UniProtKB/Swiss-Prot annotation:
InterPro entries: Metalloenz_LuxS/M16 (IPR011249), Pept_M16_N (IPR011765), Peptidase_M16_C (IPR007863), Peptidase_M16C_assoc (IPR013578), PreP_C (IPR055130). Degrades mitochondrial transit peptides after their cleavage in the intermembrane space or in the matrix, and presequence peptides; clearance of these peptides is required to keep the presequence processing machinery running. Preferentially cleaves the N-terminal side of paired basic amino acid residues. Also degrades other unstructured peptides. May function as an ATP-dependent peptidase as opposed to a metalloendopeptidase. Keywords: Hydrolase, Metal-binding, Metalloprotease, Mitochondrion, Protease, Transit peptide, Zinc. It is found in: Mitochondrion intermembrane space; Mitochondrion matrix. PANTHER family: PRESEQUENCE PROTEASE, PRESEQUENCE PROTEASE, MITOCHONDRIAL. Its main location: mitochondrion. One of its GO terms (molecular function) is zinc ion binding. Binds 1 zinc ion per subunit. The gene is CYM1. This is Presequence protease, mitochondrial.
């Protein structure tokens, strides 16, 4: 059997080194150096543009998912968010593409599987990834013109940044309020308690690096003139770092870059001056934060201690620090997790800033906690633990486990490998760290192994003595304040009042007319003919088929896995879990992997997993049947290991599943519950629209109703209930005993299947034998009662009012759901096209541009048959719900969609359908979701053949004709003013 491996032949790498030899000049670029990186099957070339000094890094690899990025060093001068707002406004039109918002227009004129722009703490970059060479050229052209020659119109600054505008734009008597996309985005961002702690910590320890995203209290100080000046000072080729990855010709990109850059000339770039605090003595900072409703009143503190540990430009020492950080902080066996969380119960979880982080000109080593009471005792235990570490050797197997994970990370081929390399390189590269050093993992590992063999623990003890023991620290603490959000609101209103009071009547007239003008611009039709586009002719008519072989309970696939074997298991649960036990599913899954077994604690199990495998996970998945939409629950286990270590996977899974201690290790279970509770509010602040969608979708779908119990607002309420009984021994033990009983019915051989993905027949045969022996050793049947999916009823539909899911945020999230059809029904494809058209041709304008929400749109869940609307970080949630409610009528009565619009909608869908997948995921859709290649092909043709008449027909059937009670809505966020919402809305408080 002929097997084709996607590798970079050494001959090709040598050819690359010959073409791009040091000193060679190509299209205005001089080659600085070229280097083979065999462990990644890749070659790297660094070049410098002779005229401007712009640097380019190319990573040549036989990967069809090519990446391009242009980035600039953009240290913020203040907290107004000027780098962030500039990132938005550069993408609102350029000299070559003078249409409004070409970036969002290109989202559905392309087959790119990734397009974005990102503002980091001291740099801004614009990456995309695509497998289509024509698409690559189109997007590269758009990104370069957008960043170097943006129009930066005042109207775009007002829309994307901030503005004063009447609440009702058409009513000059309505109150003036702050509006703006970034303004509302950051109000939502600071509602995330983890982010707020992290950003305030960063600002305190590194005051020279301001909040690049922008503090809502300061965003309204930014002027349009400041924005334009910041672009002129920073967006210049001499300050640029460009990046390419993949197998497209480098020459084409160099030629294009030279054409774009040569008119700029060379400019002196200001040297980096941003330095962190100079800790000549200990520094302590304390600030208030919002109350976390998931935590007890006496656990509303977060605190951390930080030491500054050299410069990231010393790549090897930074590498050592990160290994040390993993030993100190990662996992159950780490010293600080044990001392601060597990053994003493001083806190619920380690803090978000715990670890080793490289930030511009400094490495920080930080250890902190959240959910604590006695801050002084936490700091005392931290210092005692560091001192004890000097006398206690690190276990050799823990170090070997870390090295094993690093080795696996080089071999594990992710579909976004190029993007991940970019994310790892760019922060150091913009701050003068050698990118080749950042790529040379092998040399760092070899040097470390030699040093570790020679010095052992002395290697880490030297670092602790150099930077931590007896050295000044920076302590940062936040304490929950009951009036925190009220104070924030008052500050906003005071600032608004001050700005409004300074306005003359003439100013107010200008603001009113400006608001009308902006609305007129937002409503205007754009001439998109200047924008490049692909067509449906560029979409392959058949999708990739991944051949799998099935023999009894074993499914196998051979592909290029680079020496790794991936193992998946599934078992239909049928009657194993009664529906009233569904809220316990997350605790069950978490407990299996994190409390240990009867004979070994969690630390021992975790170290075995890290030392011998690439990871093992156990979960309960719920998937709708693609024909009937009835829910099907599965036990799902995923793992991977080097081809030579697959037996460890089965041995460890057998140990976890057959020797579980769910009802024995009660104290460890309490630790897990507290940690989950301490992180849920931050999760909700990032995913409020998902919580809303689960709540509304639960009215129409068994799958969504179950997920509402396991991951939605019902899980929040369940978690609160667990927290209330956690110290009531009898009640809590009953919970654990029920989990144990549930487990005995879940893990049986009846229906158990295994999928093996590896790169050669010999390994496949070996692992197949291991899997069959594993199945034979599992209990055959649990005698579970029959469970019928239809027994899990959907929510009653008698209350068509939106529900308010109340959280202490500064902005809202919304969702509206309605019933669709099954995956195999032909209308499903038309509904998916409708969702894309509504998003890009209606909702983006109405919800984001006019309404000021950070995001909004429509989605169609193809497997579950639910049509969803959503908005994200939305200052006007009720307005958005009204837009959603009338969307069907808009399609029938107002939309003037064209064949080009339909073409673009299909392109946006196939970006996701045809996005590259990793070798480990090939064939997984068929194994896990029971969707065959034939069903995928049939749906593909339905999507390609969908017409505008089809779209209008399904809009009428599924959006217009259903009664109001068949459209369910929800809002996540703070209480709404009574004048904008109905008292009939049910309110669900966390």
């Amino acid at each position: 059997m002929l097997r084709f491996q996607r590798t970079v032949p050494r001959v090709a790498i040598r050819r690359l080194a010959n073409v791009y030899s040091e000193g060679a000049v190509l299209h205005g670029y001089k080659v600085r150096r070229a280097q083979e990186i065999p462990e990644m099957r890749m070659a790297a070339v660094e070049l410098e543009h002779e005229m401007t000094g712009a640097r380019h890094l190319h990573l040549e690899r036989e990967d069809q998912n090519n990446v391009f990025s242009v980035g600039f060093r953009t240290p913020p001068p203040d907290a107004t968010g000027v780098p962030h707002i500039l990132e938005h406004t550069t993408l609102c039109g350029s000299q070559k593409y003078p249409v409004r918002d070409p970036f969002f227009k290109m989202l559905n004129r392309s087959l790119a599987n990734f397009m974005n722009a990102m503002t980091a703490h001291d740099h801004t970059f614009y990456p995309f990834a695509t497998t289509n060479q024509k698409d690559f050229a189109n997007l590269r052209d758009l990104y370069l013109d957008a960043t170097l020659r943006p129009l930066l119109r005042h109207a775009d600054f007002l829309q994307e940044g901030w503005r004063l505008e009447h609440r009702d734009v058409g009513d000059a008597s309505s109150e003036l309020v702050f509006k703006g996309v970034v303004y509302n985005e950051m109000k939502g961002q600071v509602s995330n308690a983890d982010y707020y702690f992290w950003i305030r910590f960063q600002e305190a320890i590194y005051p020279a690096l301001h909040n690049s995203g922008g503090d809502p209290e300061h965003i309204t100080d930014l002027s349009y003139e400041d924005l334009v000046a910041f672009h002129q000072n920073h967006y210049h080729p001499s300050n640029a770092k460009t990046f390419t990855y993949g197998n497209f010709p480098l020459r084409d990109t160099l030629r294009k870059l030279d054409d774009e850059f040569r008119g700029f000339g060379r400019r002196a770039i200001p040297q980096m001056h941003e330095k962190p605090l100079q800790l000549r003595e200990a520094v302590s900072v304390e600030e208030p934060c919002q109350i976390d409703p998931m935590l007890p009143a006496d656990k509303q503190c977060r605190t951390s201690m930080t030491w500054i540990c050299g410069n990231p430009n010393d790549v090897y020492e930074t590498f050592l620090l990160k290994i040390l950080g993993s030993l100190l902080f990662d996992g159950h066996s780490s010293a600080f997790y044990k001392k601060l969380v597990e053994e003493t119960g001083l806190a619920y979880e380690l803090s978000v800033n715990t670890g080793v982080e490289s930030q511009t000109a400094a490495n920080f080593l930080t250890v902190g906690v959240q959910g604590c009471t006695d801050v002084g005792q936490v700091h005392k235990v931290i210092m005692e633990t560091f001192t004890a570490l000097l006398a206690q050797p690190f276990e050799k197997h823990r170090v070997e486990a870390i090295l094993h994970q690093l080795e696996l990370s080089k071999k594990d081929q992710k579909s976004d490998f190029g993007l991940q390399l970019l994310y790892g390189i760019l922060p150091g590269w913009v701050n003068n760290t050698d990118p080749f050093d950042l790529l040379s993992l092998n040399s760092a590992l070899q040097r470390f192994r030699a040093d570790w063999d020679r010095e052992g623990d002395g290697l880490f003890q030297r670092l602790l003595n150099k930077y931590v023991i007896g050295k000044p620290s920076f302590t940062f603490t936040m304490v929950g304040s009951s009036d925190f959000n009220q104070v924030k609101d008052q500050n906003e209103q005071s600032k608004l009042k001050a700005k409004v009071s300074s306005l003359t009547e003439s100013d107010k007239e200008v603001i009113y007319k400006r608001g009308l003008h902006l609305q007129e611009l937002q409503n205007s039709e754009q001439d998109l003919s200047k924008l490049p586009t692909l067509t449906t002719a560029d979409i392959p008519h058949s999708s990739g088929h991944y051949f799998v072989s099935r023999d009894g309970p074993i499914t196998t696939r051979q592909t290029d896995t680079n020496g790794i074997t991936y193992i998946r298991m599934k078992r239909p649960l049928k009657g194993a879990i009664p529906y009233d036990a569904y809220p316990y599913i997350p605790l069950y899954s978490d407990g299996l992997m994190n409390i240990g077994t009867l004979l070994e604690d969690a630390s021992a199990i975790e170290e075995q997993i890290r030392l011998h495998t690439g990871g093992i996970s156990v979960s309960i998945g719920v998937h709708p049947n693609v024909e009937t939409r009835l829910s099907e629950l599965y036990l799902e286990i995923s793992a991977c290991a080097l081809n030579s270590k697959t037996q460890y996977v089965f041995d460890i899974i057998n140990k976890i599943m057959n020797e579980t201690a769910l009802s024995v290790r009660s104290e460890k279970m309490k630790v897990l519950i507290r940690a989950a509770a301490s992180s849920f509010t931050s999760y909700a602040a990032e995913n409020g629209h998902d919580l809303a969608r689960l709540h509304t979708g639960a009215h129409f779908s068994q799958t969504q109703a179950i997920m509402e119990q396991t991951a939605g607002i019902e899980q929040v309420r369940h978690m609160n209930n667990l927290m209330s009984i956690i110290e009531k021994e009898a009640e809590f033990n009953t919970v654990l005993q029920n989990l144990e009983a549930m487990h005995r019915k879940i893990f049986v051989a009846d229906g158990l299947e295994v999928m093996i993905t590896t790169d050669n027949r010999q390994t496949s045969d070996v692992v197949k034998d291991q899997a069959l022996k594993f199945i034979a050793g599992v209990q055959q049947s649990a005698g579970a009662e029959s469970w019928l999916p239809e027994k899990y009823s959907r929510r009653a539909l008698e209350k068509p009012y939106p529900a308010l899911l109340q959280f202490p945020f500064q902005v809202h999230y919304t969702a509206q759901s309605t019933q669709g059809v099954s995956y195999t029904h032909p209308d499903g494809a038309h509904l998916q096209v409708l969702a894309s058209l509504l998003t890009f041709k209606h909702l983006h304008r109405e919800v984001r541009e006019k309404g000021g929400a950070y995001g909004g749109g429509a989605t169609y869940n193809a497997t579950d048959g639910i049509f969803n609307f959503f908005s994200y970080r939305d200052p006007q949630p009720v307005r958005s719900l009204n837009i959603f409610r009338n969307a069907g009528k808009y399609v029938l009565n107002e939309a003037r969609w064209t064949a080009d619009d339909l073409n673009e909608a299909k392109l946006s869908i196939f970006q996701r359908v045809d996005a590259p997948i990793s070798p480990s995921s090939e064939g997984l859709l068929q194994f896990r979701h029971n969707i065959s290649d034939e069903q995928r092909d049939r749906r593909r043709q339905q999507l390609l053949k969908s017409t505008l008449d089809d779209v209008r027909r399904v809009a009428d059937i599924y959006l217009v004709q259903p009664s109001p009670s068949q459209h369910m809505s929800a809002v996540v966020g703070p209480e709404l003013p009574r004048e904008v919402w109905s008292s009939q809305w049910p309110v669900i408080k966390v």
